[in-house]
Amino acid sequence: MKHILFLATIFSISSFSQQNITMDVGDFNSLTIYDGIKVELKKSETNSVEITGKNSASTIVKNKNGSLKIRLNLEKKFSGETNVVLNYKEISRITSHEGAYVFSKDTIAQHELNIKAHTGSKQDYIVNTTFLNTTSATGSSIVLNGSSKYHDVTAMSGSKVFAVSLLNEETTATSSTGAVVDLAVVKEIEATVKAGGIINIHTKTEK
């Protein structure tokens, strides 16, 4: 059984009655959140979670080969009412689903960051990156502040990306099927609109 534990570590909390739970989660660089869970990211020297809220005892935390997933068990699926503080050493990819909310009060400063929001979820960050890749879909929303030299953004299916306060040198933006993208671009933008998508440019482009 030991070799299985190296591939996937699952922390099931449903057997505990306490509502305030803290645990180490091991090394990871990819994060996925489900079920309306609210997650605050905090840069740290350790990888750990602090879980509170009505459904904290029904939270499942799974780390498989550096991919960390946090969700509720089947009985409480989609219920939300769970707050997580995630202390992390490194993170390169953040994905949210099913009404989850992921945010950070601190600036995420690193070379590259990949953000994906799906199915009514929301993400909100201050960033300082060289490469920023952003995708929103199916009614989700992403709010971005700070700066990134290059920003590649795709929005679709009624989703929103609000990046008016994100300073860029170059941006590639695609909006389709009723999605809305709001951008501020310092130097250059390549914009593509399809099937009722909207891209609002809040500064002049320079060629």
Give the ranges of each region predicted by the language model:
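Intrinsically disordered, low-complexity terminal regions
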Residues: 1-207
